[in-house]
Amino acid sequence: MKLDKNKIQISIGKNPSKTFYKLQLLLKDHFPENLKTKFSFQTASGIFTGENGQIFTDEVEKIIYLGLGETSKIKIRGVAQHFFQFGEKLKKWEGVGLEIHLPKVLTNSLSADLVVYQIVNSLEQGAYAINVLAKEYKENSKKIGNVSFILQDAAKLKEAEKGLKRGKIVSRYINGVRHIAHLPANHFTPEEFVSRSKEIAKDNGLKITVFDEPQLKKEKMGGILSVCEGSDKKAKMILLEYTPVKPITKKKLAIIGKGLTFDSGGISIKPAQDMHEMKYDMCGAATAIHAIGAIAELGLGVPVIAAIGVAENMPDAAAIKPGDVYTAYNGITVEVQNTDAEGRLVLGDVLSYVGKKFKPDYMLDLATLTGAIIISLGHEAAGVMSNSDVLTNLLKEASISSDERIWEMPLWEEYSEDLKSDIADIRNVAGRAGGSLSAAKFLERFVEPGIAWAHIDIAGTAWRKKTSGTQIGNGPTGYGVRLLVDLVEKIGKKK
């Protein structure tokens, strides 16, 4: 399964399209004098004053004016969020382009690199249709016009070019996550995960290793194997390895992803309402394989491993049952009291395998693991639980620069108390209170000593209904790709 190309041709300089709109970005407190006269009626009546999000279109001159509010309050998420709509417009405009004029005050307040990077991401996501199985998708695909950037401050051109190059690469992988995440389980199976991973490996010269059922049994990966027992789709573990041509550090990062292509809950079956959304339970794994693709294509100088466990959780006569006990890869026995807490079973085996085999300096996992994290943080941030202040701080720095929000949650020992089992070493659930935190404590049992590890619960950020900042709404977001790219850059710079 190949990764789609970028939907828009984007450049810096005069727009090459035959017909295009100019998009003029305006700061409320830096309104050009000529426009004050031109918009005297509009400003007096409040129709257009440059407030953040206000739009006024001059159809005669084909100029769109977009207000960004006051300079002192401007943030990149407040700029980028407006460009999803322009990506959507380009999709419908039949070849009409967009020439984006960036004022000097904007590229002085925020770096030209960052502004162009995040605008490109928003445009590409807005222009990327996810209704790929619809008849109208195949019949109504239109030519998308060119986009170009004009900078008022010519001294910022190199910065802008850097952001453009980075944005083109990263947005392609974000849309790659969104594409496969939105596919239903009958179109995207564990086998399709293998196919997609092979394409990413081929495109970027990555080493790939696939563990099918015989290898999983040989390695005694009881967690992954127990989850798939009720499905006719066999589980897989997929490893991707990136070795930079010019490494800038010996520190190694491992990214682990949960890949449940469908989660019915198994015998502990979920309610029927909204169960269709459980096709999104593979977003952690989707992010892991696309993030390493972006990291490799950008040529970042940090060695990275991406490892994902993929399976389907279904009820069946052969399915694992509440009360069953299995032995994990690291020898721990686990009592499964709830088969709907299955993601941690898969992650446990992958975490312990990667820790023992690769001995990474840093290791993190991304998973749509608990509904409890949505109760805590809503859809605005992922929860982070870590055994390492160093890794947590690196993630916080990456979160700020990427605008993919995280929030640190505690990993206190008390949260593991209720994981005790009366028949096995540990049980897989600990009750409703602090559910995200006890889930993280469960995973911690599978992390090798000495490894800086963080668990990132993306249940609230992996898909959403409403756009917010740099996160697109109405489906999967591709959350985590930008965060991980920036994290790798931070690791590379760390002394």
UniProtKB/Swiss-Prot annotation:
Mn(2+) 1 binds at D263, D340, E342. The keyword Cytoplasm applies. Its EC number is 3.4.11.1, 3.4.11.10. The lineage of its organism: Bacteria, Pseudomonadati, Spirochaetota, Spirochaetia, Leptospirales. It holds the Pfam family Peptidase_M17. CDD domains: Peptidase_M17 (cd00433). The active site is at K270, R344. One of its GO terms (molecular function) is metalloaminopeptidase activity. GO terms for biological process: proteolysis. The gene is pepA. It comes from the Bacteria. This is Probable cytosol aminopeptidase. Belongs to the peptidase M17 family. Keywords: Aminopeptidase, Cytoplasm, Hydrolase, Manganese, Metal-binding, Protease. InterPro entries: Leucine_aapep/pepB, Macro_dom-like, Peptidase_M17_C, Peptidase_M17_leu_NH2_pept. GO terms for cellular component: cytoplasm. Presumably involved in the processing and regular turnover of intracellular proteins. Catalyzes the removal of unsubstituted N-terminal amino acids from various peptides.
